[in-house]
């Protein structure tokens, strides 16, 4: 019994262990990264990735997978760099429409029982096409209020760390500690039981897809505030990054088993790995390989621990 509890705790702590394993060599090679300025520079792009990861987590909660979150974040950035600057009301309306479209897709997937991978793969091309129509070439500019918000400096601790912690705490409380969060997770954990209790799976899935849309919008706007311009291909890699971060954080594709805190730690771990390799002037191709290697190692450890539990 005690051994099983220890195994479970070790498995739950894998996201934190992964973060420490990546952080230690960074600190040893570049001690300045622990300073206020260094940590801010190292985690400069963490907030958009964390928000995109939570968007993916909302979809994985109901046993689905979103292959369109990267193009969606890029589209939001393009809307922010064009419509939101020239005609703020139209830009806000377009962003609201994007969120409603996400919710409608969730309802459609449940109503027609269509595989989410097929729908979101098609949706990825739709988002990319709209982004290219809005911004055929890189350009545009960030609205002043977004740039100001993303440039805000918190005292003592670098802003990306503060925002990531706040996002993790608020997300954990809402999804794991509220009755609404339990019901929503139940749609992925035990949908038959939810039907017997009279809860609408269509509504639950539409709600989670809508939440994913909100996080996607926040991710795109925060990324625009950091880059100050947009591009239709700005965040394409966020699709795989977000999936990897959720899985790295302890999430599973079935059963509604997700961890908000773990997903945030996973996103930060992948961001650190990418930033560290950039500091070493290593090609971006190797950065993707490094992130994949981290994911494989953590998943292998998780499988070993699960086998230990069964034995």
Model segments located where?
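Single transmembrane alpha-helix segments in multi-pass membrane proteins
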Residues: 21-86, 109-112, 245-260, 293
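Helix-loop-helix "hairpin" substructures at the membrane interface of multi-pass membrane proteins
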Residues: 94, 100-105, 109, 156-230
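Alpha-helical transmembrane segments within multi-pass membrane transporters and channels
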Residues: 87-124, 266
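Transmembrane alpha-helical segments in multi-pass inner-membrane proteins
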Residues: 216, 226-292
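Hydrophobic alpha-helical transmembrane segments
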Residues: 13-17, 42, 50, 71-75, ...
